[in-house]
Amino acid sequence: MNDMVCAGRVTSTHGVRGCVRFRSYMSVDFKFPGIDVSIGGVSYTVCGAFSRGFPMFVLTLSRVGSACEAEKLVGFDVFLSESLLPPLQVGEYYCKDLVGLAVYDLEECVGHVSMLYDFGAAAEVLEIVLLSGKKVMIPFTSAFVADIDLNKKRLAVVFPPEI
């Protein structure tokens, strides 16, 4: 499985038959059953999934038949093949494509994107490491992100006055 992307994280066990609770980083309508995933470097097939209220799901995995086996997976990220990702609409981006982009304020490079956070609020938050080494966070909204050019590997931002 090359070109793996993180789809979420196992947060706890569910029941006594080896199911796991999973916090998804995917879109609401992503279909998990039948896909192969990697957890802790081991491959599993998702045999079943049901929602516990997005973004939480309960997954049934191949070769995990008890709560003890499921417990060993808690805390691990769940990876899947990038080829399984759904196509994006105009103006949508995958987090993996934004991390590492150079950040520009007008025409001057001022740093790079180090992380994209989703704290469950109305908007995701970009963490930017400035050339000085200082880390700043701005909302990932059109009010602060003026342009994204993946071909040029750059993101133009409008910093609030206090930054």
Curated annotation (Swiss-Prot):
GO terms for biological process: ribosomal small subunit biogenesis; rRNA processing. The keyword rRNA processing applies. GO terms for molecular function: ribosome binding. GO terms for cellular component: cytoplasm; ribosome. The keyword Chaperone applies. Its main location: cytoplasm. Keywords: Chaperone, Cytoplasm, Ribosome biogenesis, rRNA processing. Residues 90-155 form the PRC barrel domain. It comes from the Bacteria. It is found in: Cytoplasm. Belongs to the RimM family. Binds ribosomal protein uS19. The PRC barrel domain binds ribosomal protein uS19. An accessory protein needed during the final step in the assembly of 30S ribosomal subunit, possibly for assembly of the head region. Essential for efficient processing of 16S rRNA. May be needed both before and after RbfA during the maturation of 16S rRNA. It has affinity for free ribosomal 30S subunits but not for 70S ribosomes. This is Ribosome maturation factor RimM. It comes from Neorickettsia sennetsu (strain ATCC VR-367 / Miyayama) (Ehrlichia sennetsu). The lineage of its organism: Bacteria, Pseudomonadati, Pseudomonadota, Alphaproteobacteria, Rickettsiales.
